Amino acid sequence: MRDLSGLPAAAFGKYDTAPDELFYAEPRFVTHIDAYAIAAVTALYRELFPLEGVILDLMSSWVSHLPGDVPYREVIGHGMNERKLAANPKLSRFFLQNLNIDPMLPLETSSVDAAAICVSVQYLQKPVGVLRELARVLKPGSLVAITFSNRCFPTKAVMIWQAVPDVDHQRLVMFYLEQAGFGSIEARTLCPPGHSTDPLWAVIGRVPNSKSACA
């Protein structure tokens, strides 16, 4: 499969076809991975995200798993529920947007130093479009860290995510990033399956130093 045209039309459909705004209207003040997996996400962010950087937490929630002792210049949040984002103490500001309808991010080109998508990539119906926008707003050479587990809301996760085994989700996300123009793509297993913690995987992609390579 060289591009998304090789996938059936239903690959990015969902069982629940009602507007996403209805599903996310009521805030869920819960975490979707356990404390060990959360700690692994935090350690990854500590390693990868620059001090005093502008961080974009895409598809965020009432908590961001950024390390509390690291100074960032700004943390921009995005999500679908205003109450949850307003409750997140890590966010400097946030915006509401349904990326499945409009993947265009309301941010300046080359204005972000690093981006995170935590346990949410499975809900994107236009993953390559969203990631292309991330490549636009990220500075040359900067990165996005995408983390995911084996959990999801099954009525809202896209069909291809649910059809692909857990062991192949990394390959799928790497493919998304490749199609969106990212380079130096790296897959990591942060919490191996079969242990007492929730499994957790990460895929990291970097924007080429030449923005034209993302076009």
Listing of model-derived features with the role each one plays in the protein:
Residues 128-143:
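A short glycine-rich, Lys/Arg-flanked "PGG" loop and its adjoining helix->strand segment in the class I
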Residues 35-36, 40-106:
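Class I SAM-dependent methyltransferase SAM/SAH-binding core
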Residues 180-183, 190-215:
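Core SAM-dependent methyltransferase catalytic element
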Residues 1-51:
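Class I SAM-dependent methyltransferase Rossmann-like catalytic core
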